[in-house]
Amino acid sequence: MEHIARFFFGVSGNVIALFLFLSPVVTFWRIIRKRSTEDFSGVPYNMTLLNCLLSAWYGLPFVSPNNILVSTINGTGSVIEAIYVVIFLIFAVDRRARLRMLGLLSIVVSIFATVVLVSLLALHGNARKVFCGLAATIFSICMYASPLSIMRLVIKTKSVEYMPFLLSLAVFLCGTSWFIYGLLGRDPFIIIPNGCGSFLGLVQLILYFIYRKNKGPAVPAGKGEAAAAADVEDAKKVAAAVEMADATTTNKAAADTVVGDGKVVASQV
């Protein structure tokens, strides 16, 4: 019965994580149409790519037995994120931005290659699992921290304009699914990052219900029009900066995340 329940939550996590990975599609369609990345940042997609690669590697049978569902979603996520990165490279706003993306991509490839080579050539058995699990967990937690910027923005503006309900719900459900999957499999490298993702998703939902009636940036009391306008403009800039990171949430398995248009996607382990 426990195996069936674990399989169920693993499949559920795969489905929800896929939604999170695909959430920035609208943004990338805009980039393709305008043939420019404009002010969008490609950093979150490079980080999510690394997260997915490490998590997919961790889930392979010779690294971590009985975690193949972790590999399936993160393998899929790796392909999706790689496509996003390629689009950024093609439509980079200028040569400097393109070189920056290439630099980040080279770092991603170097880190992943190092983890793979060390785990294959120097480690075996449980030592290999622990090493790869730690690497994946560290970057999963970093990805789950992405929503913090959006939550700060919501509290500052008292508006949920930049934090869509469905995306926040997906982040919570994704993190929760993989958290339970990890509990049933007694795997701390899945439990820890996705526990963080589930908690942050819950906080997002709480903030949404607190400020759900405010659909536009609020004007802080006691501020003049100029100051209020500055706050609104600042809010827009912050939203644009974080725009591509929330995805979460998608985990090591994709429970860990993606941010598109002010949203986050996590990646799951």
From Swiss-Prot:
InterPro entries: SWEET (IPR047664), SWEET_rpt (IPR004316)
GO cellular component assignments: membrane; plasma membrane
GO terms (BP aspect): carbohydrate transport
Compartments it resides in: Cell membrane
Keywords, sorted A to Z: Cell membrane, Membrane, Repeat, Sugar transport, Transmembrane, Transmembrane helix, Transport
Domain MtN3/slv residue range list: 8-96, 132-215
Membrane topology: Multi-pass membrane protein
Residues in the Extracellular compartment per record: 1-6, 64-72, 122-129, 186-189
Primary localization: membrane
Parts of the chain that traverse the membrane: 7-27, 43-63, 73-93, 101-121, 130-150, 165-185, 190-210
Residues exposed to the Cytoplasmic side: 28-42, 94-100, 151-164, 211-269
GO molecular function annotations of the record: sugar transmembrane transporter activity
Assembly: Forms homooligomers and/or heterooligomers.
Family designation: Belongs to the SWEET sugar transporter family.
Function as written in the Swiss-Prot or TrEMBL entry: Mediates both low-affinity uptake and efflux of sugar across the plasma membrane.
Protein name (record): Bidirectional sugar transporter SWEET1a
Organismal lineage: Eukaryota, Viridiplantae, Streptophyta, Embryophyta, Tracheophyta
